[in-house]
C-alpha cells in the first residue's frame, strides 16, 4: 500500500518498482500520535521523513512567544532534510499536528543504497533538488513580503 503511495510522491515518482522496493527495505514506517515530537529542534537524527498520512507541523521556539508554526506539511511532503544531508542539528521541530504515519529513511542506509544503485541515486537527488528549489522560491517570496511590510513601519 505504501509503495503505491510513494509512486505519487514527487521525491519518488521517477523510481521504478524495484527501486521503490529497495527504498522501502531501508525505511521504517512509524505512527505518531497527535502532539508527538518527531524531531526536536537542535537534535541530530540523520533521517529523512516522508509523510504517508496525517500532517506534521514544523515549528520553532521563539523567545518570549513560545512555539511558532512555520508550516504544516501533508502527505507526500518530507522533512528532516537538513540534518539528513549535512548532519547538522535540526533547525526546527517537527510535531505530529494530528495522528500521522511517516516513512523514516536513515541517512546511512540510503547513502549505501545510492552508492550501490547510481540510477536510483540520480533520480532521487534530482527530484530532491527540484523540491528544494521550489521551497527556496517560496521562502524568497515570503521574505520579500515581510520586507515590504517591515518598511511600512
Region spans (language model):
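Cytosolic regulatory regions built on CNB/CRP/Popeye-like sensor folds
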Residues: 1-153
Amino acid at each position: 500500500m505504501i509503495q503505491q503511495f510513494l509512486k505519487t510522491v514527487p521525491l519518488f515518482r521517477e523510481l521504478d518498482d524495484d527501486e521503490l522496493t529497495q527504498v522501502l527495505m531501508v525505511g521504517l514506517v512509524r505512527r505518531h500520535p497527535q502532539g508527538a515530537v518527531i524531531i526536536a529542534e537542535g537534535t541530530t537524527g540523520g533521517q529523512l521523513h516522508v509523510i504517508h498520512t496525517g500532517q506534521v507541523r514544523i515549528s520553532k521556539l521563539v523567545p518570549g512567544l513560545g512555539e511558532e508554526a512555520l508550516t504544516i506539511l501533508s502527505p507526500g511532503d518530507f522533512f528532516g532534510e537538513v540534518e539528513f544531508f549535512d548532519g547538522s542539528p535540526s533547525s526546527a521541530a517537527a510535531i505530529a499536528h494530528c495522528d500521522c504515519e511517516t516513512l523514516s529513511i536513515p541517512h546511512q542506509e540510503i547513502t549505501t543504497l545510492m552508492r550501490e544503485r547510481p540510477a536510483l541515486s540520480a533520480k532521487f537527488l534530482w527530484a530532491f533538488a527540484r523540491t528544494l528549489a521550489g521551497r527556496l522560491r517560496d521562502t524568497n517570496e515570503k521574505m520579500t513580503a515581510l520586507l515590504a511590510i517591515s518598511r511600512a513601519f
